[in-house]
Amino acid sequence: RTFVKKYSASRQFTGEGYLEYRTTSGNIIDSDKDELRVEFSTVQPSGLLFYARNSGGPFADYVALELVGGRLRFSIRYGRSSHSTENLHETLLGKNLNDAKSHSVEILHDKDVTTIYLDKTSDQEKAEHSFKTKYTKLDIDVAMYVGGAFDFKALLSVKSNALFMGCIFQAEFKKILPGPEKVIDFLKDDKVTTYPRTMNQKCVAQTYEPFTFSSDDSSFVCSVGGLSSANSLSGSFVFRTYKPSGVLLKQVDGGNGFELSYMEMDVQLKVIIRNSETLLNINYQNELTKINKGNWHYVTFNISQTSFELSVGSKRETRTPAVTLPSNFFKDGLTAGGFVGCMNELIINKQKCQPNAGSRIKNVEWSGCNITDFCIFSPCLHGGECTQTGKTFSCGCSGTGYDKGPNSLSVCQFSESESTCESLKKNNPSLSLSDRSYALDFDDSGPIRTYKAFCNFSADPPTTRVESRDFKIKLTPSKQPISQRISYEPSLDAAKALARRSEWCYQFVDFGCKKAKLHTGSNNEKLGFWVSSNGVYQSYWGGAKQGSRSCACGETNPNSCIDSSKKCNCDAGLDKWHNDEGYLNSTTLLPVVEVMFKGVTSGTEANFTVGHLYCAGEISNTATFVNEDGFIKLEKWSPPSNGVISLFFKTPYEKGVLLYNGMPEKDFFQVEIINETSVGLSYNIGNGVRKIELSLGDKQVNDRSWHHVMIYHNMKVFGFRLDNQEGKHENPLFLKRELNLNNELYVAGYPYDVSKGFVGCIRGLDVNGEVQDLSKLAGEAVFVKSGCGAACENNSCKNHAKCLDNYNVYFCDCSKTPYYGYFCHEENGASFKDPGSQLVYEYPSASDVFRFDIVVGFKLGEGKPCIGDIIRLGSSDKSQFYRLSLTNRKLQFDFKGPRGQGSITIDPPSVGDFCRDVHTFALSRRYKVVNYTIDGVKKPKEEIERLDGLFTSMKKVTIGKEGDGGFKGCITGVKVTREAVGQKPETVEPIKEYLYDDKNTDLVTSKHVSRATCGPEPKVPEIPTPRPVGQRADVSTPQGITTNPKLQAEDDDKTAIIVVVVLILVLLLVVLILVIYWYWARHKGEYHTHEDDEELKATDPYIEPAAPRKLKGEEPEKKKEWYI
């Protein structure tokens, strides 16, 4: 491949010169509309193509067009700015533009729109980008440069820092508006100065057939005929690299030979004669760029009896040998390689060396120069140090506070610090924390750096402080409004990030005044404002309610301001110092961004204070997605080269899309619940769909507990976390391309199939370190509610049953009640009124259990004594028992446990006793811990040392008791659960199984027991029917609920057909009515009307064009009405 000469005025740039057009005095560019056209060809990856500058210093107008790492970088700023990055716009276009091919650039600036085109008219890959700018005018009053500049340090926003090396075929700037039109042709205009003046006027052909050494041990042997008998060796080549050091060329045999190598700042030729070394060194210490910045370097060298010579570019060094070369010093073959990089035009003693089949090749690519500058726009985040070889890169994260420890895949993405003092305490319970400063990262992996903030752990919950610098700021009287932005340490963005993730915040404000007014002036003009974090002016002050337009004293009842007719002390305008102070406490509005005062005029004095920002708690920001077609839309996930999204979810369902962004046939990512134990990530970055599936093993993800999900990507990996599981693909973006997403980010939904949506709760959604306000967004979406849980808000669960929120329907958990049915309203009771009533259940085998649960309902029989055993658990060897009975109108739990006997007396939950009405009782014993609930009221747990052990040989459940000691009345819904170590819990329901289900009859013996109802059955509504979302966990499907998605799809199809038919019929009916009405209006009965007037008839849309008009004064014909 070669450079091709296209224009007679082409200019060859050698990397040592540039063109300059001075825009001072009469040549100033003041343009609303202009064009810039540049066409170039090069093999160098970096170099300045065009630059225009203004004299406004670091905040002035400029235009920069440059090659950086083989990509085209375009950067502009119109209008002077108070910040170096304000109004700055930049973009990167194309890749591998240093391919020796011709590339064209066209930039069109038309007022507030600037568009850049790359290779617009060529057959190469095209690209374009547009900016919308705040200002419209380009002002250039210093100079325009092509190919470089005298001093790169004086240029704003230039990344290449290198003179262009290659050919420029066209460089033309055209000012269009305001007129007259002006064209500057940099290659022809006599006002353009060339530095140096000897720069070649035409481009020269250059062979470009590079090869790549892809690893440190890459090499090939270059065979040079006649070299072994030669007295000298001379050679030349060009090379480029990003590796800090390496060997370029060598031939060493014993104590003789030479080696040509490089380091960051040096190229070195070492000649060894009889183990004696002579060094020639070309130093780049004072150059703008280092050797390993990826640019091509031209090297020549010569080794002879009379001299050693080394040249790199225009730098040259010569040495005289101290000893003569031996006769057999050179060999026929020498080795090229020993570094990662590229070579081109390797010539040894006028013979061309290329890697070929006979040259003993090792890891050499022949296809071209295939190295990449990864560090020019550093992929290392948070200030990590980027080092590279041209084939890969690594990030040094030491001292950054991110990605602690050595990790070859790290890009310094994940913070080592907690986000708030609250999370620091919660996630480090073993640490001894005192009131002092700690390293915190308010946006986790976001762009805000780690900062040492003060934590007050004496407060509950702990508070985090971001410091303000604005205390007792004196205000200078002015006729104009006085405004001041509030400064925070480390930044306003950090203060906003803290407030966004906190449950509540407060901030002290104070306005001191002498004659100056704060709130209201004459004619009720508002005088004082503060700007909230969302950019809205607020007119209420510290201590007052949000939106009250008042100060603290104006909020009291009665008004406590100095002048009770005013709302602030300072509005009294007195000639003595007063103040209005207090705390602002709106988390959504804090921190204070700016204050503005109009009431500090001549003859007044004032000062103000905006105190530190204090925040506490962690906002949950929870939303409930009640149907699968409910979702929240956010802006697409960006930037394309790295990002982190994390959230918590809980659901009873085993499917549902949690996150989706992109398009199915293009770049996308999707996080989806796959089944009851697994969640998966699938994505495509342009090289096919890849998947990561993580499983919790025996634990379910649809267990109604919170589970954490995180996805992240960077230039090295795409990763996924589920709770404590993690998977990643080392599928680096830099080997393919960036994650270029279209459309919005969908939370809990999939836009291409709404039936795949997630149903459940999501909280703590964090996108690139920014907490999303799901609670607020839920109010703007359909089928989404703020908070967690929606179905249980109006549930009909009876008898103290727990409502289970399945989010689009609720279920009633009857397991801790002695009732059954969907609403826990049905009884399975038995009568124990007879003196001999008793029911005994014996397990098939005895078991040593650490836990048992008892649930029972009971009602004393009419006129029966308020005593007796209700239920008793016993061991097969009679060594232990546990008994619930009525004694002295109270319940008593007696036991003979592993360490002795004891009892607990249980009072009724309210005034009264257990001798009337229906009562429910639930007890759970786990070793020595006992929990119990009476009539739905949970009592404090008790720890009983005599129970600390196993209930050995549990065998028998006895309900009631034969004889006088038994409970006489109605007992219902007995449920007993036992659990042995290493075994699953086992539940038996003796009354239901024996009397109602006719089950386990061989395990039950009973006397004088029959079915009975202990109390009236409550009225309940119809069973709610949910929309199907898939299989539910832990809950049986109630009768009447459809869960077959195929049936639902068929129903949806039928519904759609019916809707279409109905719409067509309605449309036909409307048309028919219009036709009938038109006919009726045209042919009404006999009557006179002004519509027959000549002027009105001319505008009647229903008059036939051929109908003759009546002459003025002629009696109009009467219309007739026909009855058929």
Curated annotation (Swiss-Prot):
Residues 1011-1047, 1090-1124 are annotated as: Disordered. It is a single-pass membrane protein. Disulfide bonds join C167-C203, C342-C369, C375-C386, C380-C395, C397-C412, C761-C788, C792-C803, C797-C812, C814-C824. Residues 8-203, 210-369, 621-788 form the Laminin G-like domain. Residues 1111-1124 have a biased composition (Basic and acidic residues). Residues 371-413, 789-825 form the EGF-like domain. Residues 1-1055 are extracellular. Keywords: Disulfide bond, EGF-like domain, Membrane, Repeat, Transmembrane, Transmembrane helix. It comes from the Eukaryota. Pfam families: Laminin_G_2 (PF02210). Residues 1077-1124 are cytoplasmic. GO terms for cellular component: membrane. The chain crosses the membrane at residues 1056-1076. SMART domains: 4.1m (SM00294), EGF (SM00181), LamG (SM00282). Its main location: membrane. The keyword Ion transport does not apply. CDD domains: LamG. It is found in: Membrane. Component of the acid-insoluble organic matrix of the aragonitic skeleton (at protein level). Residues 1034-1046 have a biased composition (Polar residues). This is EGF and laminin G domain-containing protein. It comes from Acropora millepora (Staghorn coral). The lineage of its organism: Eukaryota, Metazoa, Cnidaria, Anthozoa, Hexacorallia.
